[in-house]
Amino acid sequence: MPTTICAAAARAGLACCLSLATLATAAPAAPAAPAAPGPAWVDQARLEGANSEPQNWFTAGRDQDGTYYSPLAHIDAGNVKRLGFAWAYDLGGPQRGQEATPIVVDGVMYSSGTWGYVYALDAASGKELWRYDPRGDWFAARNPCCDLVNRGVAVWKGKVYVASGDGRLHALDAATGKPVWVVDTIVDHKLPYSSTGAPQIAGDVVVIGNGGSDMGKGGVRGYVSAYDLSSGVFRWRFYTVPPAPGQRLENPELAAAAKTWDPRRDPQYKGGGTAWDGFAYDPALRLVYFGTANAAPYDLRLLGNPNLDGLYTASIIALHADSGRLAWYYQTTPNDHWDFDSVQKLILATLKIGGADRRVIMQACKNGFFYVLDRASGELLSATPFTYINWASGVDRATGRPVPTAQSDWFTSPKDVYPSWSGAHTWNPMSLSAQTHLVYIPVIDTPSVWVDLAHNGGALKFLDGFFSTNGIFPDDSYDAADLERLYGPLPALPALQAERKVKLVRELIRAWDPVARRIVWEHETSSGMRGYDGGVMSTAGNLVFQGRGSGGLWVYAADTGKVLDVINTGSHIMAAPTTYAVRGEQYVAVQVGYGGTGIAEGPVPPSSATVKFENTNRIIALKLGGGAVPTPPARRPEPFARPPEQSASKAAIEAGEVKFVEECSRCHALGINVTPDLRRLDAGLNAQFNDIVLHGILGAAGMERFDDLLSEQDVEHIHAYLIDQAWIAYRAQQAAKRP
């Protein structure tokens, strides 16, 4: 029987108890696990007994419940200052954002990197055993909203499963890395679908979703697919939103959903609701869980009636794993027009309510509420803000619906809305400690200044990734006057700051009591600018680990939040760490590298380690008694070369700025970033600019053709704008050289 810990609920007079199978501070003595039939042999029995094998990290979240908690306690508060370098492995390939948490089974580490590369390493030494290149269609590299990231693999009965960026699902032989089967999961390659999330094992099938709700002119139509674990044979598919009006509904659940969409809506808008991450599975209920993304587009007026719910977007959904039929859903954000996905990681637990055990599922949602739902029925048990919000005054317990405020309505004028479109919590994993019974959440305490581009008087009317809107971060670089030409009139920073006594843009780690529904401790991790700080792991050593963009791996006392150690890696950390043991020695490992949503928001933030050091993608492992972590090579930008002569008119340059922001800025920033700074093109690339952009002559490097979105004149204008920006930078550089 699971251990039970009781406490009084802070709201609604509910007497609650937290009961988790993993809540023992150390696993009880158990017989040694039987020898595995082969490499990477994880099955249901072994996964359910994960606490008796604390040396392994079987899933992305370690266990069936997705807690990101380890019973290992060799490294503890008393000796963590001795934690140091054990080994590092260079991932190679494109140096982009790293968001995966490595899995470790019987001394072998399995992880994924950019685009869906897979690596198998000796977990004690970092020696490469094999590496898998998924190759595929690089034209699809245009499709992900937020870099060519990948959030991990699944390991099951001798196979390693990964989804590559172009939407193919790969099953690899864990011993050799050779593909056993590969299937294409994308239903329409003409639309901007991509896959970046980790697959989910659910009974006899492997389940995968996709992304694209934000992309292109009309987004995509979300769905999840299931395939036979052994053969890759297609088993079922669940669409999360109905098709265009007049088209066939694939299942009865869509008939109910269709009533929440305008039957006259423009079919170019596909509806969104993709499931791009955050799956979970309950083997007892045989239910697979996932969250869905925002509606497409954000401006619901473009869909006709802007007051409809738009099912099943921004929802937590449970499907029967055997059939793919709907068991239940809970919509966290009906009528979503703030990009409030519900795709964040889900944690399974058990709450005792009124003397009865309630199996629950928990999520710190992008919309700022911490949800506890009965995972058998979807009944709402609690919804409590875990950070500052102003878009809603609360959740009506009678209806389960949030109560929006006047501040949330940006249709009439630009508004600062908390949380921002990036969410109060996004993909970065949170962790539930079995020792303290607290959930450790990487929190983004930031608003968006939402702008209706189509009606606010600026030159920009469309922005790839935002449709006809934009959500601007009022960070330390925010200047309303400077932004007005593109975006129209915006609120000034002092007016925005009047709402808060803290920096408008900041990130924190918060210890959250899911029973009492309150903050126990917190630390600010970034301030003034987005830091893109990392996911969280906790251990039975009374430790909480979180990496930061500044390159430090921070270690806290799990009970009090006291800072115990900071280990400098010289690399930006976004992923959650893992911990494991080999031959009795405990290791902590983390995958490092900057990218993700940050590349769409401008240059690398000044606090990031990527400003000082090259963005070398690595897995870094630590152990007691290790030394300092070797940092990547120092970043030494070449000086600006003299740009080509400018022959374009002011009007052409201004038109080029609009097109650059509209179609190019999602990947390219003018400054340090993981993609090229296009002010620094050499003579050869300047001469080939049109062929690169329109005809994709650098497609093999990930820069595919854009002749379907840009005309020859558009490209000439963009080039003129970049040359203008290059001259500005070059003149400033030359002026700085003068005595």
Feature locations, PLM:
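Blade/loop signatures of beta-propeller domains
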Residues: 31-85, 244-255, 497-499, 505-510, ...
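Electrostatic cytochrome c docking/interface patches
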Residues: 42-45, 634-659
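Repeat-blade elements of multi-bladed beta-propeller folds
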Residues: 57-61, 97-117, 142-168, 194-217, ...
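Extracytoplasmic beta-rich repeat domains
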Residues: 89-101, 131-154, 182-198, 214, ...
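C-terminal substrate/ligand-recognition segments
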Residues: 100-112, 123, 425-450, 463-567, ...
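Short, conserved, GDST-rich strand-edge loop motifs in beta-rich repeat architectures
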Residues: 208-222, 263, 290-310, 414-415, ...
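Extracytoplasmic electron-transfer domains, predominantly the class I c-type cytochrome c fold
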Residues: 287, 547, 590-596, 609, ...
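Sequence/structural segment immediately N-terminal to covalent heme-attachment motifs in c-type
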Residues: 648-670, 685-695
